[in-house]
From Swiss-Prot:
Taxonomic placement: Eukaryota, Metazoa, Chordata, Craniata, Vertebrata
Skewed-composition ranges (Pro residues): 31-42
Compartmental location: Cytoplasm
Matching Gene3D superfamilies: 3.30.160.20, 3.30.70.330
Gene name for this UniProt entry: rbm46
Protein name per the record: Probable RNA-binding protein 46
InterPro entries per record: HnRNP_R/Q_splicing_fac, Nucleotide-bd_a/b_plait_sf, RBD_domain_sf, RBM46_RRM1, RBM46_RRM2, RRM_dom
Signal peptide start-end: none
Region of interest: Disordered: 23-42
């Protein structure tokens, strides 16, 4: 940094009275500001700032963000070279000032032709730890994590939907603060760290987005997880209706989780208090209020650019509900960001899914599917192709069928055939949209391959290319069930051979 820039930073410190300290790859301005008494501001007061020019520093940035109100702390992420990393966090003293910063400064032209992005920062204290042995218990995982990292408060482990004595190959580790979690991630992220002889995978667990109290006050749907695969919707309706017969409007079960819709909120809250922790069919269940999906999604401008919250519509009543997913895979919840059953979890994987300009003269290099990272695949169809390719299997064939649904709708369903394995898979749901039917069929195939492969397939984040297993996940596509009328081939559709779509005759279905 040149002397003029240092002088500008010193002048800023003199004007404001704030201190400035650089540590752990970030430079902290303030925190607390002069004269501040009491604890730091609670959650919801911090904004994330992305797309900052790399040669811009606090002397230019702080005055811009002061327009929105009193700043408690400004944290600029720094490179070893002295340049910033393109993003920062600004904590205000009140929620209103943070919201004002978003309104005023999102897409603000910070320099000619340079626009920054500003959005709510989610104070993350959880890490996702993948590729752990499936026979390890919560206590063992917590003990090991406390040995290698500081500030561990809790470990969240979910049992396999197939074998409740095993975990799903991943865990969530809760730390006492975002700083403690960041330090732990920094220590574990290189990819060479091992637990029990396994190279573990580490990433941020995407924090649950806060919803306004007014929205949550209208929710009358319960989210139930940790169910046995054999538990039926009828069993759930009976169990949740015990306190008040007739209070349950409908039940939608998707593998080992379900949504219980009540006619009114009071009955839902009563059932929540009574049923949380209850054992159904030998499995202790977890019950929470279902969270409506936010209207603005999970847009963010960080180094990963986008955090894609997974939502699912259809069959869930008055509004969409947030499928809180993370790299876990279960039949109904192949989750956002290579996830699935973390439907039960308040997290989703963040994928680099922003669009960038294709510059004239750019060099194009042919690549094969082997060179693509699993984290770059966001659909079950792509992941199934990837999985087959990695295992030297034939690529999946999609056989398309139709049936007459309710109200005369034409329903679509795919059967997935993997010839080299002599196996075929068909989901138990049908769709009205062709692409959804294909995605659902691929999800179902991935789920069944996971169930049948035992420990050979780990359902945690994408593993290094040299590892002996593959993890995967994709967006969840729950659909209302329709009576299975006689299935027949649909009308011909135009498609390229590359799509490998098959419109079979009736006999091939049997």
């Amino acid at each position: 940094m040149d002397s003029s820039k240092e002088a500008a930073l010193l002048a800023l410190m003199d004007r404001t009275g704030y201190s400035m300290v650089q540590e752990n790859g970030q430079r902290k301005f303030g925190g607390p500001p002069p004269g501040w008494e009491g604890p730091p501001p609670p959650r919801g007061r911090e904004v994330f700032v992305g797309k900052i020019p790399r040669d811009m520093y606090e002397d230019e940035l702080v005055p811009v963000f002061e327009q929105a109100g009193h700043i408690y702390e400004f944290r600029l992420m720094m490179e070893f070279s002295g340049e910033n990393r393109g993003y920062a966090f600004v904590m205000y003293t009140t929620r209103e000032k943070a919201q004002r910063a978003i309104q005023l400064l999102d897409n603000y032209e910070i320099r000619p032709g340079k626009f920054i992005g500003v959005c709510v920062s989610l104070d993350n204290c959880r890490l996702f730890i993948g590729s752990i042995p499936k026979d390890k218990k919560k206590e063992e995982i917590q003990e090991e994590m406390m040995k290698v990292t500081e500030g561990v408060m809790d470990v969240i482990v979910y049992p396999s939907a197939v074998d409740r004595m095993k975990n799903r190959g991943f865990a969530f580790v809760e730390y006492e603060s975002h700083k403690a979690a960041a330090m732990a991630r920094r220590k574990l992220i290189p990819g060479t760290f091992q637990l029990w002889g396994h190279t573990i995978q580490v990433d941020w667990a995407e924090p649950e987005k806060e919803l306004d109290e007014e929205t949550m006050q209208r929710v009358r749907v319960l989210y139930v997880r940790n169910l046995m695969l054999s538990t039926t919707e009828e069993t759930l309706r009976s169990e949740f209706s015990q306190l008040k017969p007739g209070s349950v409007e409908r039940v939608k079960k998707l593998t080992d989780y379900a949504f219980i819709h009540f006619y009114n909120r009071e009955d839902a809250l009563t059932a929540l208090e009574s049923m949380n922790g209850k054992v159904i069919d030998g499995s202790p269940i977890e019950v929470t209020l279902a969270k409506p999906a936010s209207k603005d999604g999970n847009k963010r401008f960080g180094p990963r650019n986008c955090h894609n919250g997974v939502t699912a519509a259809g069959g869930y009543g008055d509004s969409n509900f947030l499928f809180r997913t993370r790299n876990d895979m279960t039949i109904g919840a192949m989750g956002n960001g290579l996830n699935a059953h973390a439907l039960s979890l308040p997290y989703a994987v963040d994928l680099d899914r922003c669009v960038y300009p294709f510059l004239p003269g750019s060099t194009l290099v042919p690549v094969s599917l082997n060179t693509v990272k699993p984290s770059q695949l966001s659909s079950a169809v792509s992941l199934l192709d990837y999985y087959c390719h990695k295992n030297d299997w034939s690529l999946p064939e999609y056989h398309l069928y139709s049936l007459a649904g309710q109200e005369g709708k034409v329903m679509l369903i795919y059967k997935v055939v993997i010839s080299s394995t002599r196996r075929s898979f068909m989901p138990d749901k049908v769709c009205t949209i062709l692409e959804d039917a294909k995605e659902l069929a691929a999800q179902n195939a991935l789920w069944n391959l996971d169930c049948s492969s035992g420990s050979s397939l780990n359902v945690s984040p994408p593993a290094p290319s040299g590892s002996g297993f593959l993890s995967f996940g994709c967006r969840s596509l729950p659909y209302p069930a329709y009576p299975m009328a006689s299935i027949s081939p649909p009308l011909p559709i135009s498609c390229s051979s590359a799509q490998r779509l098959f419109i079979p005759n009736q006999s091939s279905f049997l």
